[in-house]
């Protein structure tokens, strides 16, 4: 068994990791050989001397799958350095964003309301941290505003094009 600690950037991402890799009986998250699991294995480093335990609010303990790469770490103390953790946090946030966006679009296409989709996502992914509800609702609102602005700009450009085609003087003249 190869166990390693990873410090994630927020409680929401720590909860999401627990969704991706359900904990075993001892509470350690069992990493699978999926895409993100392979990334976790790829960033793993080994030390000949014991590594100090990570401290902080959002430290999760991971158990790596046994494969050709992780077998090498059975005789070493595995760890992630700060750069590895930063990269893995960025990748985890991207996986989270893709999962949320796909879930939201699917719910939207089925005609569900924004609040219901976000609530269902939070419940299904077991994201019970206090700020998760607000963070996801604000994200949906900001994306909605950006979409509205993009549509508005396209309509304005279309109106100017049509007006210039019809009236050689143009709208602004």
For each of these PLM feature ranges, what is it?
Residues 91-110:
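Positively charged, polyanion-binding regions of nucleic-acid-associated proteins
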Residues 106-125:
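Short, charged amphipathic recognition helices of the HTH superfamily
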Residues 161, 165-173:
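Intrinsically disordered, low-complexity, charge-dense segments enriched in Lys/Arg
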Residues 138-150:
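Short, solvent-exposed alpha-helical "recognition" segments
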Residues 79, 84-95:
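Extended non-catalytic interaction/regulatory regions in multidomain proteins
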Residues 147-164:
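Short Lys/Arg-enriched helix C-cap and helix-to-coil transition segments
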Residues 1-80, 84:
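Long, low-complexity interaction regions most often at the N-terminus
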Residues 122-137, 160-162:
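Short, basic interhelical loop/turn and adjoining N-cap
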């Amino acid at each position: 068994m190869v166990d390693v600690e990873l410090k994630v950037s927020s409680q929401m991402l720590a909860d999401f990791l627990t969704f991706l890799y359900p904990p075993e009986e001892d509470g350690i998250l069992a990493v699978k050989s999926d895409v993100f699991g392979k990334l976790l294995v790829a960033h793993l480093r080994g030390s000949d001397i014991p590594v100090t335990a990570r401290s902080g609010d959002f430290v999760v303990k991971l158990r790596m799958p046994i494969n050709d790469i992780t077998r090498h770490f059975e005789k070493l103390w595995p760890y992630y350095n700060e750069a590895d953790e930063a990269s893995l946090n960025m990748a985890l946030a991207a996986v989270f964003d893709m999962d949320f966006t796909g879930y939201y679009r699917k719910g939207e296409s089925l005609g569900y309301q924004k609040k219901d989709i976000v609530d269902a996502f939070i419940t299904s992914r077991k994201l019970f941290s206090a700020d998760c509800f607000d963070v996801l609702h604000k994200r949906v609102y900001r994306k909605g505003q950006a979409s509205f602005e993009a549509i508005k700009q396209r309509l304005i450009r279309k109106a100017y094009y049509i007006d210039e085609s019809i009236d050689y003087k143009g709208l602004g003249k």
